[in-house]
């Protein structure tokens, strides 16, 4: 039987519940704990029904069980406001933290762009940016690897029903963290991010718009080829990631229009924002788990998360 790395999920909301479904299909990850604060939450109930251990006492309810149950990776899908403390407590026990909040106290990870850069660094906290960042930063990077990008702007439009209370509390952090990652991972000299929460019924699929201003006249053929190649990379783990229109060239502006359909693991397929975030987090954790299984990554208890500014 293939060895699996045991995981805990913190936050049984939309993102945590969708992620749980993906982890149960993973060849190298085994979810064993779901952590919440409301014993009546739908996410904790679903986890219990799946045979996952649960606690409604927050991370403090998990800590006594971490070593006994062999938890080595934790996913935090709570809020930017509590993530730093959650990470500190679990890092102290040698648990690697995958951060799905916009806290961004660890380095950014957007798998098709910079996943392999995290190999061998013994990082104890990795930040998955935001759903909007995961959907759009690959496109900014696809342009910036061809030629310098002076400015990158992304607009993520998501259905209101797919946006839980944690994300709503973190709108400012969402925009700051995404804009910072457009620069640091996407390669734009200046980045801007906008999120639109659409209340339409029936709910609309996630749509994303990316605008890049190149410093010199765009090499249309090279940029188009780069974008098409990057789309294929994202589709390896998010099959519903589609280029709807573009790249459209207007002077030095390059525009790309995307939509992201989910797998429907928890919320229906319109919630592609959940899928692109949870699939990216699972892919990242799988890389670290493969390192652990090979003996190439030994987690060190007490290692503090590395600090990254969220400009």
Curated annotation (Swiss-Prot):
This is Acetaldehyde dehydrogenase. NAD(+) binds at residues 162-170, 273. One of its GO terms (biological process) is catabolic process. Its EC number is 1.2.1.10. It is an enzyme of class 1 (oxidoreductase). InterPro entries: Acetaldehyde_dehydrogenase, Acetylaldehyde_DH_C, NAD(P)-bd_dom_sf, Semialdehyde_DH_NAD-bd. Keywords: Aromatic hydrocarbons catabolism, NAD, Oxidoreductase. The lineage of its organism: Bacteria, Pseudomonadati, Pseudomonadota, Betaproteobacteria, Burkholderiales. Pfam families: AcetDehyd-dimer, Semialdhyde_dh. It catalyses: acetaldehyde + NAD(+) + CoA = acetyl-CoA + NADH + H(+). The active site is at residue 131. Belongs to the acetaldehyde dehydrogenase family. It comes from the Bacteria. One of its GO terms (molecular function) is NAD binding.
């Amino acid at each position: 039987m293939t060895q699996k790395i045991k995981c805990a999920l913190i936050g049984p909301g939309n993102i945590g519940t969708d992620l749980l479904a993906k982890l149960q299909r993973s060849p190298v990850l085994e979810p064993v704990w779901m952590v919440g604060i409301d014993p009546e939450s739908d996410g904790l109930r679903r986890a219990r029904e799946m045979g996952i251990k649960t606690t409604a006492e927050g991370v403090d309810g998990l800590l006594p069980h971490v070593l006994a149950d062999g938890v080595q990776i934790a996913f935090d899908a709570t809020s930017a406001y509590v993530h730093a403390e959650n990470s500190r407590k679990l890092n102290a026990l040698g648990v690697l933290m995958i951060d799905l909040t916009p806290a961004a106290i660890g380095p950014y990870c957007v798998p098709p762009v910079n996943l392999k850069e995290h190999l061998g660094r013994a990082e104890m906290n990795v930040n998955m940016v935001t759903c909007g960042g995961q959907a759009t930063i690959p496109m900014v990077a696809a342009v910036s690897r061809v030629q310098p990008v002076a400015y990158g702007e992304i607009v993520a439009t998501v259905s209101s029903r797919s946006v839980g209370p944690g994300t709503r509390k973190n709108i400012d952090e969402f925009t700051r963290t995404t804009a910072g990652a457009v620069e640091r991972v996407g390669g734009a000299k200046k980045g801007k991010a906008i999120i639109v929460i659409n209340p339409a019924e029936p709910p609309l699929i996630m749509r994303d718009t990316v605008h890049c201003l190149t410093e010199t006249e765009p090499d249309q053929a090279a940029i188009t080829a780069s974008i098409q190649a990057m789309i294929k990379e994202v589709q390896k783990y998010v099959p519903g990631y589609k280029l709807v229109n573009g790249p459209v060239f207007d002077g030095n502006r390059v525009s790309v229009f995307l939509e992201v359909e989910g797998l429907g693991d928890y919320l229906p397929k319109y919630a592609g924002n959940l899928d692109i975030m949870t699939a990216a987090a699972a892919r990242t954790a799988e890389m670290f788990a493969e390192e652990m299984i090979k003996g190439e990554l030994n987690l060190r208890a007490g290692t503090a998360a590395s600090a990254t500014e969220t400009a």
